[in-house]
């Protein structure tokens, strides 16, 4: 910059460098003088826009665009770049403006459709009623000109979708339906399944039950058994009793000719549940007898089975007999095995309690079924799931519910039950190496054991998680990852998890632009919603917090860019991917296997404010801001049940940060009271740990002490001269207490490392499965010891990571 003076490119690239280093305000200040002069390069405009967008000020960047267009003319190339820039920044107002300019200067049908789409999206987003009415009127008027006769026409299915969107936007459902049922629309409806489904939805929404039944019945009779078609039949019959007999006749006729179609059975089961209760049990039994070999059958039947009374449940089980099934060839043997597993699932669903006595016989039956499955799976590909693997999963679920619900078990016995479940799943994976149904609970089980994170991560690495799944599945491993394994390895996992959000920022706008170019209007709103869900993802915020924590705990002060900036988080975490066989009275297995409360918006807000209170406010001597942050945290703590999202150690951490924030200004002004320090002293003294304290708690205690010492160091620097001597005494007292606590943590981690083998040997010696007499467990003691060796390595790696933390506390 010194060499080139005010050269635009140098200033712009310098601003980009500052923004990437987390110095966003300085980057914006550097770009400010350029607002008065037109930028002569589209590339530089894109960089300027990216810098402003990084600071959540993307709208301001259009000052540069307007100057550019005024100076260099509204050529089509420039206006197209302006349109795409608007998409990148999610500015619908500028997108509409760019589309209007394109249509005005370069008239075409495509540009007019861009105007309609932009008006539609903008009116849906607008919160101003007057503006909303105006935008709707403009969208409707433009759509009428281009789509309706005599001036217009519809040229494709995508244009039809856009036309319907506008009509539904203005609340004209009847007009939209009339357009769909007109004979001119038939070729589009026949060619586009989504248009057909929209027609079904509009017929139901407009309460045209006769037309809905006739149309859906015609589809059904020609072989279309899509569930939305089936639902349309059910809805029309629900609103018109005269349709019940024809509905029953058409279903039974279809079942008589195609008895293995899943949706036909589900339609009959639902219809019998609603309209023909005397035939409901028969419908359920018919589905079981025809499709028992399909694993999905249990998931389909589960809600209906739970509604049956006990007598009906037992009648159903008695009516389906394994002895009636043939097994003269390999295929029949496999089918019979799936029937056996289905019955095991239903019995699991009907369990009232999971005591050791009630579980023993059931687990034995599961093991027998699993062994049968292995003998029948020898010809499968390595990527296939072994036959009957769910029998093993059912045994594991039994152990999990017994572990959770049996209060008489000693802690060592409960830990051993977890290890039993781990060994079962590890054995299952040796036969079914790509089975995520086994791997996800295995990850959670490892995390329930002290020092289990590296072992869990090793399993997670084998799952080949796609980038798109990072937002939905990474939470199974990485929730509170810093607490459970504070190392550079964790930082690597978190950075990998965050890559999808960078891809979303750059790739999704390009996909939206391509959709406009290709005229794929039905996809644009879905793409925008997808982009928004990732932009405001709850997991994104949690991951950014964890990245800040891991940098902070391992001697690196994180720049501000590491802190979450998204508001109104959208929770995309997949909590239902776990197989679930239990009744509604039980918590799901996913809930049972959580090693800590599920963090959500409250956790994010408290953690971000607390981190900022220490690193941004107190460290920099901005104590007035620290007080405001502390009061904000105080309100959040008072108005919420913290235990639903925070661990007990995190609650203590928040209380300490509130105390430090409120104390900061008083220390600076010299009007604090010694009782304030006594409160903090008592809080730190309450940290009670021993050799059996989990490593995760030691990590959190170290983090709390680190925050305390960081704040005390700043207080010592900023305290008023008149109180310096007195404060130094308080500082020294708290420092000594903290040093002793850190010394104890170091001593405990050393002891834990030495006792790693003893810890795992206790898991093996207390095994519940190995003590079951006359039970053939699917793994031998040698295999359990191999799993134990892996757990020892995991435990030692974790103790090494935790033992390093006290060294990074800066006194």
Swiss-Prot record:
Task: Provide the GO biological process annotations.
Answer: cytoskeleton organization; mitotic actomyosin contractile ring assembly; protein maturation
Please name the InterPro entries in this protein's record. NAA25_NatB_aux_su
Q: Output one GO MF annotation.
A: acetyltransferase activator activity
**For this UniProt entry, which segments traverse the membrane?**
none
Where does the UniProt annotation locate this protein?
Cytoplasm
Chain's role: Non-catalytic subunit of the NatB N-terminal acetyltransferase, which catalyzes acetylation of the amino-terminal methionine residues of all proteins beginning with Met-Asp or Met-Glu and of some proteins beginning with Met-Asn or Met-Met.
Q: What is this protein called?
A: N-terminal acetyltransferase B complex subunit arm1
């Amino acid at each position: 910059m010194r060499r080139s003076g005010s050269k635009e490119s140098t200033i712009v690239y310098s601003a980009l460098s500052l923004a990437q280093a987390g110095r966003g305000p300085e980057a914006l200040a550097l770009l400010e003088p350029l607002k008065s002069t037109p930028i002569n390069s589209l590339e530089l405009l894109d960089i300027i826009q990216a810098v402003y967008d990084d600071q959540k000020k993307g709208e301001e960047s259009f000052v540069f665009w307007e100057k550019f267009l005024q100076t260099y003319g509204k050529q089509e190339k420039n206006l197209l770049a302006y349109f795409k820039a608007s998409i990148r920044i999610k500015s619908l107002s500028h997108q509409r403006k760019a589309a209007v300019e394109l249509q005005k200067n370069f008239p075409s049908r495509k540009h007019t459709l861009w105007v309609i789409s932009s008006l539609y999206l903008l009116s849906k987003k607008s919160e101003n009623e007057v503006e909303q009415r105006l935008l709707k009127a403009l969208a409707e008027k433009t759509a009428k000109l281009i789509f309706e006769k005599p001036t217009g026409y519809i040229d494709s299915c995508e244009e039809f979708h856009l036309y319907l969107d506008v009509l539904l936007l203005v609340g004209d459902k009847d007009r939209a339906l009339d357009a769909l049922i007109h004979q001119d629309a038939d070729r589009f409806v026949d060619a586009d399944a989504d248009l057909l489904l929209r027609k079904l939805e509009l017929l139901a929404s407009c309460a045209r039950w006769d037309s809905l039944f006739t149309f859906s019945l015609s589809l059904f009779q020609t072989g279309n058994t899509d569930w939305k078609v089936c639902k349309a039949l059910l809805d029309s019959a629900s609103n018109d009793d005269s349709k019940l007999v024809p509905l029953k006749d058409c279903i039974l006729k279809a079942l008589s000719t195609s008895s293995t179609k899943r949706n036909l059975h589900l339609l009959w089961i639902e219809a019998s549940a609603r309209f023909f209760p005397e035939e409901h049990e028969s419908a359920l039994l018919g589905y079981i007898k025809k499709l028992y070999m399909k694993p999905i059958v249990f998931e389909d039947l589960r809600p209906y089975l739970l509604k049956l009374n006990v007598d009906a449940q037992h009648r159903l089980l008695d009516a389906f007999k394994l002895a009636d099934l043939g097994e003269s060839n390999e295929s029949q043997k496999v089918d019979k095995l799936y029937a056996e597993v289905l019955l095991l699932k239903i019995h699991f669903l009907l369990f009232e309690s999971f005591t050791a006595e009630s579980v023993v016989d059931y687990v034995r039956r599961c093991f027998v079924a699993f062994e049968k499955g292995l003998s029948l799976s020898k010809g499968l590909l390595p990527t296939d799931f072994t036959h009957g693997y769910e029998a093993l999963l059912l045994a594991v679920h039994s152990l999990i519910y017994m572990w959770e619900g049996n209060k008489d078990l000693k802690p060592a016995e409960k830990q051993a039950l977890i290890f039993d479940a781990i060994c079962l799943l590890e054995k299952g994976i040796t036969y079914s190496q790509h089975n995520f149904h086994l791997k996800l609970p295995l990850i959670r089980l490892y995390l329930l054991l002290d020092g289990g994170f590296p072992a869990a991560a090793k399993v997670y690495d084998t799952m080949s998680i796609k980038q798109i799944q990072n937002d939905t599945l990474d939470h199974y491993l990485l929730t509170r990852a810093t607490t459970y394994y504070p190392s550079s390895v964790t930082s690597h996992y978190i950075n990998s998890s965050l890559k999808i959000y960078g891809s979303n920022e750059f790739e999704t706008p390009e996909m939206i632009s391509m959709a406009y170019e290709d005229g794929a209007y039905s996809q644009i709103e879905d793409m925008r919603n997808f982009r928004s869900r990732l932009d405001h993802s709850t997991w994104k915020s949690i991951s950014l917090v964890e990245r800040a924590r891991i940098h902070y705990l391992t001697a690196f002060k994180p720049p501000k860019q590491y802190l979450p900036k998204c508001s109104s988080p959208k929770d995309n975490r997949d909590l239902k991917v776990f197989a679930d066989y239990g009744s509604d009275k039980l918590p799901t297995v996913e809930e049972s296997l959580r090693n800590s409360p599920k963090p959500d918006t409250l956790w994010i807000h408290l953690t971000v404010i607390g981190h900022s209170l220490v690193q941004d406010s107190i460290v920099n001597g901005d104590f007035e801001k620290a007080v405001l942050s502390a009061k904000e945290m105080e309100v959040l703590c008072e108005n919420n049940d913290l235990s639903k999202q925070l661990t007990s150690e995190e609650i203590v951490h928040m209380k300490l940060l509130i105390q430090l924030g409120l104390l900061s200004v008083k220390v600076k002004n010299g009007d604090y009271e010694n009782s304030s320090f006594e409160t903090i002293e008592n809080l730190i003294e309450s940290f009670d740990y021993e050799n059996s304290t989990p490593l995760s708690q030691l990590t959190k205690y170290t983090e709390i002490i680190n925050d305390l010492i960081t704040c005390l160091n700043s207080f010592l620097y900023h305290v008023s001269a008149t109180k310096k001597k007195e404060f130094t005494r308080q500082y020294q007292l708290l420092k000594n207490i903290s040093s002793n606590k850190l010394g104890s943590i170091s001593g405990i981690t050393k002891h834990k490392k030495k006792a790693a083998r003893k810890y795992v040997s206790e898991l093996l010696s207390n095994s519940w499965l190995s003590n079951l007499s006359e039970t053939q467990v699917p793994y031998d003691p040698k295999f359990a010891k191999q799993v134990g060796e892996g757990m020892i390595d995991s435990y030692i790696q974790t103790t090494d990571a935790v033992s390093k933390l006290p060294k990074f506390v800066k006194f």
